[in-house]
């Protein structure tokens, strides 16, 4: 039968229309009355009856009535050629064949066996079909179909309806169960039908009518449970009469579906003919929608045949403002990005408006669904169910009352209510009224009370809770422990049947100790109330409730019950003992007057959900809702949201391989010194985590009767282990995984000690499993030497090993060796860091806590073995076992390993250079220094001359040279400037800028006499010109003290301008400039500036914009203070007298103010001696802090220090510490050098530098090949040399950097890279040097 024929027949079968069902009630009583009315209409001879009183006799009448029509079902039938004129007769024959193909089943016999599965005759199958139909639909759908079918005219269809009515009456009498959950939708070609169904439909042609498909036999899977018979049908979707029938067209439209959780929208086909919700793989990838495997794995037919093996999680979708939540099957190809099926629309009461091309949502008809009933065998305990008990004040149980002890009695809580909107006010009043009615709260006169707030419940209503956070600060903690989840799950091993109990309003089952009620007072707009039962929100409530329930359950808790708070799980190994176990627990609860929430209880199940896990006899997996919570998580916007996400992941970490590795990029964002910046790395990390949760592994229950295997391993930074047990199929299945960081001290352990540490930590982690084993369990390690250390009875090497050996005596185990290649799980775990486990403190060492590592791959091993053939000594060890034994060297996987677990390598080879480069430049430690790099490499490798080779490599590293500061003393001794012979011959000048504006000025011009130290202070502006400065200097200095012989100043543009040069020529003085970025050459002015600024702060710190008004006072104060260098005041040296500084003091005049007088000459001579002595003293102290000058020769490469305000300074803190390298042109003084700066910066900076600002650039051509990033080469200036290395031509080029155009650099690069940068220069060099390329 073709798919097209099937679709046609499907439409023809829907030839009936529904009646208007508005206002129809759907209780069982109304449904029975509805049946009675239909029967009265079609079988009037039965008469009316009261179905509430006489249902059984009514059904008997129906049975008797149908026995009067035996002729309808003859034992034989005649085959006829059918035409359109004989269609009804053909349909009747079809109905007859379905009942009596074997000729052994009468209508009455069929009625007496409703729903029972016996044999394989067609009647039984038809019965199963009706049972499936009955359980497939909810009540509303069922009524719609009954009312529609009861009004059709053709006889045989009416007969089918009449048959189904008494059958349905029986089902309503037997049970109250409706199945509203829609089964998975299958393609027609995959749907399994009976042979009769296929044979019959092959005879139909497209023009013919056929029977409604809901009355055709289908294959069913029937399972029996304790109370109900449930039938699940694998079927094609049931099309609704609202949308699709033979008189209506197939509706199709395309709407934009909004996915708010993923901030995207997709075009979605709305098609009443589509059999399932589908979405294309391309759409899933584009919007990163989470998916999971689909075990059904069917073929989806049609125009685009697809094999489906994945589906999305339930997604929140908005269509025309209507919100729904549904899943999609993922297909490779479809006509639209996504499609919504008819079933999804119907389930969400959504109608299609074909005229408006829109969707609308109808009001849902509520179904009356009763809570699950308590099984009959436990009816004696029905008085402890929530159905029979309303919430009331419980009786106090002595010794188990809730006690609230405070750290202090005299405390006050803040008095403030949270504002409540009208909706919450109503909820609050309802809660208060209910609490007062039941007696669990009462009005209070307490002086301290906490505010109330509201939290949403799962069903959408609000729960009033008290915010006890202010009170919790004063409550003494309860140290009663909550159980560990892992230990609870361990008790379940071996159990096959489970019952889960949930206590109703669990906290409210415990009375508050008399006298403590006022401590739990709360306030709201209605007043102040206090709890008489234990409330939610108090910090000590969980611990007290755990103590309470443990005490109530007593001894049963230890054998067959586990409980976590109000969740109680009863587990047993057989059905018979389980009944006894459940009754024991229910009796305990009854004795304590506790109430169970029947709606949340599950009895006699093979698998249950408990405290977030799906538990069965095989093991446990996380509940799907916890997985969906992570899968639906949006991108975190801040640290708080990221911590919440990682908290959800951490709950599931035991099911996620390599959790720490996956979350590493996310944890980096939580560090205090890391700025929040979301990158694709974090996005990918979240996607990787979600993919791991699509199908999490099953962890088995630990069973003490099974063999135990512990596999351990240690990496450089962590330890790992996997605990497994051997099952009946002789395979080991995991019980748990473990990994943990090492502490700083542990990082320095030897390899053997690290491997031993992995065993110790694993045994401590699973001590509750492994400490009491009768038979020895097996430990596998990939470190052969460890076996001897554990089994050796000689004295331990150190105290640590002695402690470990003492600890191992508590365990019954045997240890075996297995190569690391076979121990891949534990090996991988040891390279994962469990970031939730605290790192143990250890005072033995404080060295670095992270070590790089090189992967020992097969290629690496082959390379080492190849290098061994070139080293005579190592080759001898490789081939001579006796020699290896003599030198305590092992041969492992082709590698020579010494007693320190170091791999022996030939000295100074390409391999050793590669190792150094990987650890220095490509590892997780960023360019470690010589000592650190040496220590790291020595942990895994050793060769002759290793320290020297590492030192040479690090010293020649370009990145280290330009970015790392130097720790040596500065170069160059101090060269003091000789003092002048008299005042105002030699001056120094500078500007103090960045002053607040005062009277129009914002800078200060400072002139200092180098002999007397006298200062002249002149207010000015920062925008002062050279001409204005010259005029000011003429009026304030030359006019009073005459022409100077020399002036020392910095390289300010004013003093280097042509205007100032003309001014100096006019007054015949020489300009001398201090070295750039060398304040010591003009230290006098710098020191004077500091003193002036200090004096200004003293006089105008409160009113800084008045500093101009105080300049004369500051100048007078400075010039009349005794200077440490001259031992006299500047004013006295210049003017030869001391002025009066207060009204109580008279000025002192000298009799000889003539500068040529003997006294004046003597004073000047004394000042000069003091200045010389001061210079010698300064030089002595300065030179103690410097080291010998490093002599540079012309042509040497040097780097220039980037000072805070100097050469090529960048405000960016991450800018390199040095610029360059530059070539030395010549030496221009005792301590100064002239450098070859690029033309682009020559006009900006002086090319002369003091030696203290220079560092030699080290460059070993044998070590540094292709050190330049090709994107950094701008313009090649010239090529210095070339080398052939491993059949590759390298060029040493001098170039202008692309990244920093102001810098000329040099380095090695490949020929190809150089040609891309400047083809002409490279070709000229090749031609001039006769290179064969």
Curated annotation (Swiss-Prot):
The entry's Mg(2+) 1-binding residues are: 502, 566-567
**PTM statement from Swiss-Prot or TrEMBL:** Processing of the polyproteins proceeds by an ordered pathway, called maturation. It involves the initial cleavage of a 27 kDa capsid protein (CA) from the N-terminus of the polyprotein, followed by the cleavage of a 56 kDa integrase (IN) from the C-terminus. This leaves a 72 kDa protease-reverse transcriptase fusion protein (PR-RT), which does not seem to be processed further.
Q: Which residues form the active site?
A: 271 (for protease activity)
Its cellular-component GO annotations read:
nucleus
Q: Which residues span the membrane?
A: none
Keywords in alphabetical order: Aspartyl protease, DNA integration, DNA recombination, DNA-binding, DNA-directed DNA polymerase, Endonuclease, Hydrolase, Magnesium, Metal-binding, Multifunctional enzyme, Nuclease, Nucleotidyltransferase, Protease, RNA-binding, RNA-directed DNA polymerase, Transferase, Transposable element
Reverse transcriptase domain location: 436-615
PROSITE patterns, per this entry?
Answer: ASP_PROTEASE, INTEGRASE, RT_POL
List residues of the Peptidase A2 domain: 266-342
What is one Pfam family matched by this protein?
SH3_Tf2-1
Q: Which SUPFAM superfamilies does the entry link to?
A: DNA/RNA polymerases, Ribonuclease H-like
Q: Which residues form a coiled coil?
A: none
Task: Using the record's annotation, list all stretches that form the Integrase catalytic domain.
Answer: 979-1138
Query: Which Gene3D superfamilies does the record cross-reference, listed alphabetically?
Result: 1.10.340.70, 3.10.20.370, 3.30.70.270, Acid Proteases, HIV Type 1 Reverse Transcriptase, subunit A, domain 1, Ribonuclease H-like superfamily/Ribonuclease H
Keyword DNA-binding set for record: yes
Q: Name one GO molecular function term.
A: DNA binding
Q: What InterPro entries does the record tag this protein with? A: Aspartic_peptidase_AS, DNA/RNA_pol_sf, Integrase_cat-core, Integrase_H2C2, Peptidase_aspartic_dom_sf, Retrovirus_Pol_polyprotein, Rev_trsase/Diguanyl_cyclase, RNaseH-like_sf
List of residues binding Mg(2+) 2: 990, 1050
Q: Which GO terms fall under biological process for this protein? A: DNA integration; DNA recombination; proteolysis
Entry keyword Cell membrane: no
Q: Which PANTHER family match?
A: PROTEIN CBG26694, PROTEIN NYNRIN-LIKE
Q: What else is known?
A: Retrotransposons are mobile genetic entities that are able to replicate via an RNA intermediate and a reverse transcription step. In contrast to retroviruses, retrotransposons are non-infectious, lack an envelope and remain intracellular. Tf2 retrotransposons belong to the gypsy-like elements (metaviridae).
Please report the name of this protein according to its UniProt entry. Answer: Transposon Tf2-11 polyprotein
């Amino acid at each position: 039968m073709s798919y097209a024929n099937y679709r046609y027949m499907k439409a023809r079968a829907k030839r009936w229309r529904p009646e208007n069902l508005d206002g129809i009630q759907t209780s069982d009583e109304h449904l029975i009355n509805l049946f009675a009315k239909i029967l009265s209409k079609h079988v009037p001879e039965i008469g009316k009856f009261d179905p509430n009183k006489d249902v059984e006799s009514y059904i008997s009448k129906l049975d008797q009535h149908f026995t009067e029509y035996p002729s309808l079902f003859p034992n034989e039938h005649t085959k006829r050629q059918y035409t359109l004129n004989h269609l009804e007769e053909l349909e009747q024959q079809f109905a007859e064949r379905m009942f009596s193909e074997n000729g052994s089943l009468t209508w009455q016999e069929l009625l007496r066996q409703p729903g029972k599965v016996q044999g394989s005759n067609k009647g039984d199958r038809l019965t199963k079909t009706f049972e499936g139909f009955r359980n497939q639909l909810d009540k509303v759908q069922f009524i719609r179909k009954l009312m529609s079918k009861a009004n059709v005219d053709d006889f045989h269809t009416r007969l089918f309806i009449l048959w189904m009515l008494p059958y349905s009456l029986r089902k309503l009498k037997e049970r109250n169960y409706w199945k509203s959950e829609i089964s998975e939708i299958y393609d027609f070609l995959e749907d399994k039908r009976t042979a009769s169904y296929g044979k019959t439909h092959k005879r139909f042609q497209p023009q013919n009518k056929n029977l409604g498909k809901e009355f055709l036999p289908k294959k069913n899977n029937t399972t029996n449970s304790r109370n109900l018979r449930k039938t699940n049908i694998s079927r094609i979707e049931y099309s609704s009469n609202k949308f699709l029938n033979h008189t209506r067209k197939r509706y199709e439209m395309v709407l934009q579906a909004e996915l708010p959780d993923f901030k995207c929208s997709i075009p979605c086909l709305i098609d009443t003919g589509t059999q399932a919700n589908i979405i294309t793989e391309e759409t899933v990838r584009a919007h990163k929608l989470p998916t999971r495997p689909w075990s059904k794995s069917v073929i989806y037919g049609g125009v685009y045949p697809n094999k489906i093996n994945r589906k999305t999680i339930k997604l929140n979708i908005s269509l025309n403002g209507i919100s729904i939540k549904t899943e999609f099957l993922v297909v490779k190809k479809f006509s639209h990005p996504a499609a919504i099926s008819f079933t999804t629309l119907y389930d969400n009461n959504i109608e299609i408006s074909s005229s408006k091309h829109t969707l609308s949502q109808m009001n849902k008809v509520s179904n009356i669904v009763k809570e699950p009933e308590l099984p009959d065998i436990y009816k004696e305990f029905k008085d402890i169910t929530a159905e029979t008990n309303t919430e009331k004040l419980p009786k106090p149980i002595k010794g188990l009352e809730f006690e609230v002890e405070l750290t202090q009695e005299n405390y006050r809580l803040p008095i403030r209510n949270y504002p409540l909107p009208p909706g919450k006010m109503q909820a609050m009043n309802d809660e208060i009224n209910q609490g007062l009615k039941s007696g669990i709260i009462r009005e209070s006169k307490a002086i301290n009370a906490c505010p109330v707030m509201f939290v949403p419940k799962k069903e959408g209503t609000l729960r009033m809770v008290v915010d006890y956070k202010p009170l919790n600060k004063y409550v003494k903690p309860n140290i009663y422990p909550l159980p560990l989840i892992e230990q609870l799950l361990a008790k379940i091993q071996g159990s096959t049947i489970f019952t889960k109990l949930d206590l109703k309003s669990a906290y409210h089952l415990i009375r508050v100790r008399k006298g403590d009620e006022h401590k739990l007072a709360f306030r709201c707009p209605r007043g102040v109330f206090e709890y008489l039962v234990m409330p939610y929100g108090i910090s000590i409530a969980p611990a007290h409730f755990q103590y309470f329930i443990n005490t109530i359950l007593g001894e049963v808790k230890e054998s067959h019950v586990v409980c976590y708070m109000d969740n109680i799980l009863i587990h047993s190994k057989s059905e018979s003992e389980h009944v006894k176990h459940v009754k024991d627990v229910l009796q305990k609860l009854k004795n304590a007057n506790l109430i169970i929430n029947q709606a949340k209880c599950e009895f006699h199940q093979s698998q249950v959900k408990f405290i977030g896990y799906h538990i069965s006899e095989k093991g446990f997996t996380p509940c799907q809702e916890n997985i969906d919570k992570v899968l639906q998580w949006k991108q975190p916007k801040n640290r708080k949201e990221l911590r919440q996400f990682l908290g959800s992941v951490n709950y599931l970490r035991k099911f996620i391989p390599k959790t720490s590795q996956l979350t590493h990029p996310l944890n980096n964002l939580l560090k205090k010194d890391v700025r929040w910046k979301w990158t694709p790395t974090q996005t990918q990390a979240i996607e990787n985590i979600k993919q791991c949760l699509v199908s999490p592994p099953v962890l088995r229950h630990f069973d003490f009767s099974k063999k135990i295997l512990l596999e351990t391993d240690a990496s450089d930074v962590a330890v790992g282990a996997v605990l497994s047990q051997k099952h009946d199929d002789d395979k080991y299945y995991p019980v748990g995984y473990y990994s943990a960081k090492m502490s700083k001290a542990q990082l320095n352990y030897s390899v053997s000690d690290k491997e031993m540490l992995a065993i110790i930590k694993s045994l401590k982690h699973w001590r509750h499993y492994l400490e009491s084993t009768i038979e020895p369990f097996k430990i596998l390690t990939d470190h052969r030497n460890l076996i001897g250390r554990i089994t050796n009875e000689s004295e331990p090497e150190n105290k640590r090993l002695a402690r470990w050996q003492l600890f191992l005596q508590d365990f019954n185990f045997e240890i075996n060796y297995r190569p690391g290649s076979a121990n891949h799980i534990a090996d991988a775990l040891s390279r994962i860091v469990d970031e939730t486990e605290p790192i143990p403190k250890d005072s033995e060492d404080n060295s670095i806590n992270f070590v790089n590592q090189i992967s020992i791959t097969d290629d690496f091993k082959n390379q080492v073995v190849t290098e061994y053939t070139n080293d005579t000594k190592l080759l001898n060890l490789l081939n001579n076992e006796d020699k290896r034994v003599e030198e305590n060297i092992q041969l492992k996987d082709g590698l020579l390993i010494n007693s320190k677990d170091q791999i022996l390598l030939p000295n100074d080879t390409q391999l050793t250079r590669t190792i150094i480069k990987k650890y220095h430049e490509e590892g997780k430690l960023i360019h470690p220094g010589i000592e650190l790099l040496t220590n790291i490499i020595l942990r895994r490798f050793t060769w002759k001359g290793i320290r020297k080779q590492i030192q040479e490599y690090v010293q020649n590293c370009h990145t280290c040279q330009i970015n790392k500061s130097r720790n040596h003393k500065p170069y160059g001794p101090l060269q003091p400037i000789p003092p002048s012979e008299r005042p105002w011959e030699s001056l120094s000048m500078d500007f103090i800028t960045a002053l607040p504006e005062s009277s129009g000025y914002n800078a200060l011009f400072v002139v200092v006499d180098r002999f007397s130290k006298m200062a002249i202070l002149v207010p000015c502006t920062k925008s002062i010109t050279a001409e204005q400065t010259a005029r000011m200097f003429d009026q304030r200095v030359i006019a009073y003290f005459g022409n100077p012989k020399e002036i020392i100043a910095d390289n300010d543009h004013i003093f280097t301008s042509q205007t100032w040069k003309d001014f100096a020529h006019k007054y015949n003085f020489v300009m001398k400039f201090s070295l750039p970025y060398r304040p010591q050459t003009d230290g006098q002015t710098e020191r004077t500036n500091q003193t002036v600024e200090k004096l200004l702060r003293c006089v105008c710190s409160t009113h800084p914009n008045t500093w101009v008004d105080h300049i004369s006072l500051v100048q007078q104060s400075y010039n009349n203070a005794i200077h440490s260098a001259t031992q006299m005041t500047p004013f006295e040296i210049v003017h030869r007298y001391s002025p009066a500084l207060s009204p109580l003091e008279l000025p002192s005049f000298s009799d000889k103010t003539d500068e040529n007088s003997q006294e004046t000459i003597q004073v000047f001579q004394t000042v000069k001696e003091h200045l010389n002595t001061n210079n010698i003293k300064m030089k002595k102290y300065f030179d103690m802090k410097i080291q010998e000058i490093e002599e540079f020769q012309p042509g040497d490469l040097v780097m220039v220090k980037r000072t805070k305000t100097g050469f090529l300074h960048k405000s960016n803190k991450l800018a390199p510490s040095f610029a360059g390298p530059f070539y030395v042109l010549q030496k221009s003084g005792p301590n100064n050098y002239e450098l070859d700066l690029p033309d682009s910066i020559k006009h900006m900076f002086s090319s002369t530098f003091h030696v203290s600002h220079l560092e030699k650039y080290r460059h070993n051509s044998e070590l540094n090949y292709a050190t330049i990033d090709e994107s950094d080469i701008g313009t090649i200036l010239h090529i210095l040399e070339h080398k052939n290395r491993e059949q590759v031509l390298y060029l040493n080029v001098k170039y202008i950097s692309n990244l920093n155009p102001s810098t000329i650099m040099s380095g090695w690069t490949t020929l190809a890279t150089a040609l891309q940068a400047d083809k002409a220069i490279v070709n000229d060099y090749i031609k001039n040097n006769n290179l064969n390329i």
